[in-house]
Structures are given as C-alpha cells and as structure tokens.
Amino acid sequence: FLKPLGFNNTYALAVRKDTAEKYNLKSISDLSGISQEFLMGPTIEFANREDGLLGLNKAYNLNFKDVKPVDGGLRYTALMNKESDVIDAFTTDGLLDKFGLEVLEDDKNFFPPYYAAPLIRMDTLKEHPELEEVLNLLANKITDKTMRKLNYEVDVNGRDPETVANEFLVSEGYID
C-alpha cells in the first residue's frame, strides 16, 4: 500500500432531513431511546454483518420497530417513499447528496475505517519506481466530501468515471 488518499469510505446511517429535524437526530446515539419508532431499511449485506446492523444494534442499544433488508440500489428509493426511516450508506456515496439526506455521526466510532490507498505490485514498483512519488502526491488530498462530490457526478449525473477523475486531477493541478 502507498499513502492513504484521505477519504474514509466507511458505513454510515442516513435519514431524511424531515426525520432528522423532527427528532433532532445528529448522531446514532440520538436513535438509542427512540429506535423502536423507526423502520430500518438496510442492504441485505449490512443487515447480516457483525460490523453492520448486528453489532450496531448492540453497540448503540438500538431496537428498530422493523428491519426490512432491501437491494442496495433500492434503499434510497424506499427511504424517500417512506417505506423505511433509516438506511445504511457509505460516507462517500453521491446519492446522499442527491436525496439531501442527513448522515448521523457515528459518535461511538463503531464502524471500522475504510481508508482508500493505492495498491501496487512490488515488481511493478521496482520497474517504475517513479510511480510511488507520483501516486503519493494524492496522499490526504481527497476528503470524504470531495469523494462524495465525484461519486455524485458518476452515480447521479451519469458521467464517465475516467472523465470525472481526469477533470479532478486537472482542477487540482496534478495534470495538464
């Protein structure tokens, strides 16, 4: 691994803005005493992971009214259609911005970090040692917010990932 890029694409819980305002939700702990009023609409994978819903319920003492796992892409639609009140997401997901969702702070640091870092084969690095210096120029330069914006361009606006990445690198002065 080379140096991390700076963003953490970890799990998060998200709610609609109206729900966050009505219940004054800012952190996952805020759900603790009232989770029984909410429908949880997690992805199937998140629902069955110890570092997902299973462990989260224990760590935060959550007891949702109902848990209805859904396909990953459908969880946002279900949330916006009020078929669920809380969903899991990734912190760099562009759909969070598309739907104007409130991401609840993981105030107990339950979710493990998922830092992005370039991975390169040693034989490739020996053949092209300049790659390490070039790739490390991006170390700690891409925030969660920036990555979410880039993902938004791809996932919401349907833009080509390579084009979006190239535009970012040009705008930040890494390439011409």
What are these regions (language model features)?
Residues 54-59, 72-87:
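Short helices/loops that flank or line small-molecule/ion binding pockets
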Residues 36-39, 57-70:
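A local structural motif
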Residues 1-2, 83, 95-109:
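Ligand-binding "clamshell"
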